[in-house]
């Protein structure tokens, strides 16, 4: 079976790469988060399952008697993605796969701001605690990937409490 892990960028068909779209159209089974499955192009197979845990996905793929399957992820498969855990699980299970990366949120934000991002420091505050003041004190632009309890508002509040309230913050949301 051909297994393809696909980054869906902002989660809409418009942010799929051509290779990602081709892999989706050729898949007989598509797995991923429910919100992503709901956004798939209409031409994709209706055989879909809302799974996002690596072990559950591996178990479903092992018992699938099909030629091609796809697993979708929001953002880019290489930027703080659940794809990394799935890659480890697929490797351990001996299941071969390919990866089609998507457009990351940092790329989408940089494009919206008309700014290059090669000098930005990239920090994940998604589902984990972080000290934004310590990160921002080096003077470089910082991109925080947020989620869970670490929202843009909580990061800005922490900056203000750390005497860094003069730091300019830009929030990118629903970029796709």
Where are these regions (language model features)?
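A contiguous loop/helix-start segment that scaffolds small-molecule binding in enzyme catalytic cores
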Residues: 2-5, 18-19, 66-69, 138-176
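Hydrophobic side chains in well-ordered alpha-helices
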Residues: 82, 109, 154-158
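Short, glycine-/small-residue-rich phosphate/pyrophosphate-handling segment
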Residues: 105-138, 147
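Solvent-exposed alpha-helices and their adjacent loops that cap or buttress functional pockets
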Residues: 22-23, 63-64, 91, 113-116, ...
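Class I S-adenosyl-L-methionine
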Residues: 1-103, 107-108, 127-131
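Short loop/edge segments at beta-strand edges and connector loops
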Residues: 101, 124, 173
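Generic secondary-structure signature for well-ordered alpha-helical cores
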Residues: 29-32, 114-118, 160-165, 174
């Amino acid at each position: 079976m051909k297994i393809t892990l696909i980054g869906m960028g902002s989660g809409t068909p418009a942010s799929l790469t051509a290779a990602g779209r081709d892999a989706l159209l050729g898949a007989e089974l598509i797995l991923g988060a429910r919100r992503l499955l709901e956004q798939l192009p209409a031409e994709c197979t209706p055989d879909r399952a809302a799974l996002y845990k690596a072990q559950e996905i591996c178990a479903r793929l092992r018992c699938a008697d099909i030629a091609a399957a796809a697993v979708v992820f929001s953002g880019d498969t290489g930027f703080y993605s659940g794809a990394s855990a799935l890659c480890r699980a697929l490797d351990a299970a001996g299941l071969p796969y390919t990866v089609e990366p998507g457009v990351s949120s940092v790329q989408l934000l940089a494009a919206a701001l008309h700014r290059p991002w090669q000098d930005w420091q990239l920090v994940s505050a998604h589902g984990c605690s972080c000290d934004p003041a310590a990160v921002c004190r080096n003077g470089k632009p910082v991109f925080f990937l947020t989620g869970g309890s670490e929202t843009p508002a909580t990061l800005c509040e922490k900056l203000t409490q750390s005497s860094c309230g003069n730091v300019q913050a830009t929030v990118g949301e629903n970029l796709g």
